[in-house]
Amino acid sequence: MYRNQLARASLRSTSSINQIRNMITAQAVVYAQHGEPKDVLKTLKYEIDDDNLDSNSIIVKTLGSPVNPSDINQIQGVYPSKPEKTTELGSNEPVAVCGNEGLFEILKVGDNVSNFKVGDWCVPTSVNMGTWRTHMLCGGDEMTKIPNPEQSKANGKPSGLSVNQGATISVNPLTAYLMLTHYVKLTPGKDWFIQNGGNSAVGKYATQISNLLGINSISVIRDRPDLQDLIKNMTEECGATKVITEEQNASKEFGSEIKSWVKETGGEIKLALNCVGGKNSTGIARKLNNNGLMLTYGGMSMQPVILPTSLHIFKNITSSGFWVTQLLKNDVELKRKTLGQIIEWYENRQLKDAPSKETKFNPSDELSRYYIDGIVNSKGGKQLIVY
């Protein structure tokens, strides 16, 4: 509602720009109907009135915004959380701006905004802000400040955040950290967690974060020709305690080997993180000790989670879903606290970000083309549009 009020006061469609003295020309990637991205995404050009800024609002420019699977699912209409469709940007029909994650720089602040100054970096406080755009007009409370490189340096930190780190901080790193810390108390040096999808972005963040917290990890990965090189990378670069294959995860005989690892530390496997489903999820659930918890945050195999009845009855295993959007939706303070921890690790060079394929936007081009291409190329890795 607040953004709609701001829009009426400070946004103009390109047809009325002759009446305005000082305007910021912007582009956004929008859709009016759900469908396949190549069929429904369009570029909407609009203007932001830089001279008549509401006292409680800010104007930001985008530094980078990624393409996430959830963004694609929103466009297709199959994601539970959907942005509101409006005409606030001057479109002829209600449209939604794509994108949920991104990094922004403050261009201008209203007179009543005290938590930002020009040049600050920020990320959206809530979901469905619509980050696939060049500029945004929003309320000062709709963004959360994160340090820019100059501020990190001034605070004596070894490193400042990169655009990739800032633009991708709100989903994968937060997902990994919250799954490890929000539900089960894991004793450093003793306890373990096990995860499938160990080579995924969230998997690598979870491995690194568990290492920083002193928690032992078991990562399950697919067998491949360069298996030993990958295992070496995950143990030496990410800090994985143990890395096993899907075949070993499914093997009852190999289970005794895992029990010996856990016995050496005097702890338990209390947590399993599942992003695959199917028999793979059964395998990691079987490794849990009594009263263990399995969190499911994805389903890459498109197969249902399968848990034998015996695990529920005799081991009291709990299986729950994890959705970072829902968890943080009504808990802004938890998001800020979690962001602060991830930022600290980035600044101290203790946490490595998942790499993205960066594509530089040319303002003379149609913005939607970059994201349509990014969606196509996302099968080969994370895509980040930088500005």
UniProtKB/Swiss-Prot annotation:
Membership in a protein family: Belongs to the zinc-containing alcohol dehydrogenase family. Quinone oxidoreductase subfamily.
UniProt keyword Transit peptide, yes or no: yes
GO cellular component: mitochondrial matrix
SUPFAM superfamilies (alphabetical): GroES-like, NAD(P)-binding Rossmann-fold domains
Catalytic residues (UniProt): Y79
Catalytic activity as recorded in UniProt: a 2,3-saturated acyl-[ACP] + NADP(+) = a (2E)-enoyl-[ACP] + NADPH + H(+)
Function: Catalyzes the NADPH-dependent reduction of trans-2-enoyl thioesters in mitochondrial fatty acid synthesis (fatty acid synthesis type II). Fatty acid chain elongation in mitochondria uses acyl carrier protein (ACP) as an acyl group carrier, but the enzyme accepts both ACP and CoA thioesters as substrates in vitro. Required for respiration and the maintenance of the mitochondrial compartment.
Source species: Debaryomyces hansenii (strain ATCC 36239 / CBS 767 / BCRC 21394 / JCM 1990 / NBRC 0083 / IGC 2968) (Yeast)
GO biological process: fatty acid biosynthetic process
Extent of the transit peptide: 1-23
Protein name: Enoyl-[acyl-carrier-protein] reductase 2, mitochondrial
CDD domains: ETR
Chief subcellular location: mitochondrion
Binding positions (NADP(+)): 172, 199-202, 222-224, 297-300, 322-324, 382
Keywords, alphabetical: Fatty acid biosynthesis, Fatty acid metabolism, Lipid biosynthesis, Lipid metabolism, Mitochondrion, NADP, Oxidoreductase, Transit peptide
Localization (cell): Mitochondrion matrix
EC number per UniProt: 1.3.1.104
Subunit structure: Homodimer.
Record carries keyword Mitochondrion: yes
GO molecular function (one): enoyl-[acyl-carrier-protein] reductase (NADPH) activity
